[in-house]
Amino acid sequence: MNMVFLGPPGAGKGTYAKRLIEMLNIPHISTGDMFREAVASKSELGKKVEEILKRGDLVPDDLTNSIVKDRLSKEDCKNGFILDGFPRTVAQAKALDEIMRSLGKDLDYVIYFEVDEEEVVKRISNRRICSNCGKIYNLITLPPKVDGKCDVCGGTLYQREDDKEEVVRKRYRVYMENTYPVIEYYQKSNKLFTVNGALDVDSVIKEVLNIIRR
């Protein structure tokens, strides 16, 4: 079962993937993890990625595509995978089609977690992180017992720069401009399934399971 998860920042893709991989016994593959693995491997590809990331640049499509193909060809993907963070553009979606063909696989489901801008802003701008142990809180859904202090270690909670409201709104708009065409691309191939990402986690998981068990 080969799946792609799409959705704006704060849609919960990583959370849903972590729950589902335990049920389905397939790996969760994110581009961030793939880049880190490539760098750690010290391969020629990894060295190129490391140089690009150190400069703060985006990894170009040709390199990203090579890393995705390499990861999807590994043994643990033989029964399926959940791909998160790729494709982000129509060009990458077409490249993924080619990658799947070259590996003799099909893409079974593209799940789009639909969340509106205000919900994304509410989720991300209320996120706080412990400066000491890294535990993540949400002032609305998972608040600390003492305002501004970590329940675990007593460390001070802070807000990341890219979690601030104006930045979150920009990230959402960039996502919709760049990635929404990918959603339209998959609609044409009848592989796209939309899930209401504003529901609670258990309800979203149930929706996804209903889709893949039809």
Swiss-Prot record:
Pfam families named among the record's database cross-references: ADK (PF00406), ADK_lid (PF05191)
Chain positions covered by the region annotation NMP: 30-59
Binding site for AMP: 31, 36, 57-59, 85-88, 92, 160, 171
Positions annotated to bind Zn(2+): 130, 133, 150, 153
Catalysed reactions, as listed in the record: AMP + ATP = 2 ADP
GO BP annotation list: AMP salvage
InterPro entries the UniProt entry points to: Adenyl_kin_sub, Adenylat/UMP-CMP_kin, Adenylat_kinase_CS, Adenylate_kinase_lid-dom, P-loop_NTPase
Listed GO MF terms: adenylate kinase activity; ATP binding; zinc ion binding
SUPFAM superfamilies: P-loop containing nucleoside triphosphate hydrolases
Pathway: Purine metabolism; AMP biosynthesis via salvage pathway; AMP from ADP: step 1/1
Entry's transmembrane regions: none
Keywords linked to the UniProt accession: ATP-binding, Cytoplasm, Kinase, Metal-binding, Nucleotide biosynthesis, Nucleotide-binding, Transferase, Zinc
Residues the entry annotates as binding ATP: 10-15, 127, 136-137, 199
The keyword Transferase is assigned to this record: yes
Protein family (similarity comment): Belongs to the adenylate kinase family.
Record text about domains: Consists of three domains, a large central CORE domain and two small peripheral domains, NMPbind and LID, which undergo movements during catalysis. The LID domain closes over the site of phosphoryl transfer upon ATP binding. Assembling and dissambling the active center during each catalytic cycle provides an effective means to prevent ATP hydrolysis. Some bacteria have evolved a zinc-coordinating structure that stabilizes the LID domain.
Subunit structure, as described in the record: Monomer.
UniProt name for this protein: Adenylate kinase
Organism of this sequence: Thermosipho africanus (strain TCF52B)
